[in-house]
């Protein structure tokens, strides 16, 4: 019985070793995984009132996330003279409605 378990373990070990993903490169602090980096004139955390109002607009809001208002995409390289006087942000949900430009935003450290 022990020999069967030992043989099974020896057969399974190479399969586990080859299936393990290699660690990737660490990401730069200025990288935005979900798209472009935006410059938002105003950022705020939603409260229950704005979250309820957003439901009426059809825009789901996470109460723990930042909202971005009056946002424009910026280039990480600063090509074309793009700069951001406010804090650059990376947003997971770019829903451009009449009131809210970006959802679930987090600040990004970018030297523009």
UniProtKB/Swiss-Prot annotation:
Q: Which top-rank group of organisms is this from?
A: Eukaryota
MF terms from GO for this chain are:
structural constituent of cell wall
Q: Cross-referenced InterPro entries, in alphabetical order?
A: Hydrophobin (IPR001338), Hydrophobin_CS (IPR019778)
Q: Localized where?
A: Secreted; Secreted, Cell wall
Tissues showing expression: Expressed in tissue fractions consisting of undifferentiated white hyphae. Not expressed in the outermost cell layers of the pileipellis but in the cell layers adjacent to that.
Q: Kindly list the cysteine pairs connected by disulfide bridges.
A: 32-90, 39-84, 40-71, 91-105
Query: According to its record, what are the GO cellular component terms?
Result: extracellular region; fungal-type cell wall
Which family is this sequence assigned to? Belongs to the fungal hydrophobin family.
Q: What is this protein called?
A: Class I hydrophobin A
Q: Which gene encodes it?
A: hypA
């Amino acid at each position: 019985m022990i020999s069967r378990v030992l043989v099974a373990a020896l057969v399974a070990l190479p399969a586990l070793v080859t299936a393990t993903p290699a660690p990737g490169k660490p990401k730069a602090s200025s990288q935005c995984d979900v798209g472009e980096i935006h410059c938002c004139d105003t950022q705020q955390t939603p409260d229950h009132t704005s979250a309820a109002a957003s439901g009426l607009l059809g825009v789901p809001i996470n109460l723990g996330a930042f909202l971005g208002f009056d946002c424009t995409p910026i280039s990480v390289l600063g090509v074309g003279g793009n700069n951001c006087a406010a804090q650059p942000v990376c947003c997971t949900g770019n829903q451009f409605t009449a009131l809210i430009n970006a959802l679930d935003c987090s600040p990004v450290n970018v030297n523009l």
